[in-house]
UniProtKB/Swiss-Prot annotation:
Family (UniProt): Belongs to the MAX family.
Protein source organism: Rattus norvegicus
Subunit structure: Efficient DNA binding requires dimerization with another bHLH protein. Binds DNA as a heterodimer with MYC or MAD. Part of the E2F6.com-1 complex in G0 phase composed of E2F6, MGA, MAX, TFDP1, CBX3, BAT8, EUHMTASE1, RING1, RNF2, MBLR, L3MBTL2 and YAF2. Component of some MLL1/MLL complex, at least composed of the core components KMT2A/MLL1, ASH2L, HCFC1/HCF1, WDR5 and RBBP5, as well as the facultative components BACC1, CHD8, E2F6, HSP70, INO80C, KANSL1, LAS1L, MAX, MCRS1, MGA, MYST1/MOF, PELP1, PHF20, PRP31, RING2, RUVB1/TIP49A, RUVB2/TIP49B, SENP3, TAF1, TAF4, TAF6, TAF7, TAF9 and TEX10.
Assigned GO CC terms: chromatin; dendrite; Mad-Max complex; MLL1 complex; Myc-Max complex; nucleus; PML body; protein-DNA complex
Region of interest (Disordered), ranges: 1-40, 105-160
Sorted UniProt keywords: Acetylation, Activator, Cell projection, DNA-binding, Nucleus, Phosphoprotein, Repressor, Transcription, Transcription regulation
Gene3D superfamilies per record: Helix-loop-helix DNA-binding domain (4.10.280.10)
Protein name (Swiss-Prot/TrEMBL): Protein max
Cellular localisation: Nucleus; Cell projection, Dendrite
Biased composition (Polar residues): 107-124
Length: 160
């Protein structure tokens, strides 16, 4: 952003050539005042954009220092959030892959269970316990204990 952005400045070329030296000086002073006011307003806007400085009095050097710190903080935070997003995308892809594998296993298990057995409503799970065909293979009883929401855990993936 240059000093001339958002400022309407009249050039000296538009003025009649017969201006006195005093008129030229007054015009130049007015342009300089506009430029300084624009810079002042820009610093106030920057100060109000930095959370630690909002509404406080601060020198221009302090405003620039705090703005620099805030930008660096936001960059680090953005980088961390981007890493979290990437981790969640990888975790989501893994979970989708597991869902597809489980659906495939379930469909192949259903093909095997189509053959008559003595009691097809009871099966054994991987731990050797008896489960009902209707509970989906869960080891916990959802009737006796309310299910507590599980905290989301980060999935650590090793590079392959």
């Amino acid at each position: 952003m240059s000093d001339n952005d958002d400022i309407e400045v009249e050039s000296d070329e538009e003025q009649p050539r017969f201006q006195s030296a005093a008129d030229k000086r007054a015009h130049h002073n007015a342009l300089e005042r506009k430029r300084r006011d624009h810079i002042k307003d820009s610093f106030h806007s920057l100060r109000d954009s930095v959370p630690s400085l909002q509404g406080e009095k601060a020198s221009r050097a302090q405003i620039l220092d705090k703005a620099t710190e805030y930008i660096q903080y936001m960059r680090r935070k953005n980088h961390t959030h981007q890493q979290d997003i990437d981790d969640l995308k990888r975790q989501n892809a893994l979970l989708e892959q597991q869902v597809r594998a489980l659906e495939k296993a379930r469909s192949s298990a259903q093909l095997q269970t189509n053959y008559p057995s003595s009691d097809n409503s009871l099966y054994t799970n991987a731990k050797g316990g008896t489960i009902s065909a209707f509970d989906g293979g869960s080891d916990s009883s959802s009737e006796s204990e309310p299910e507590e929401p599980q905290n989301r855990k980060k999935l650590r993936m090793e590079a392959s």
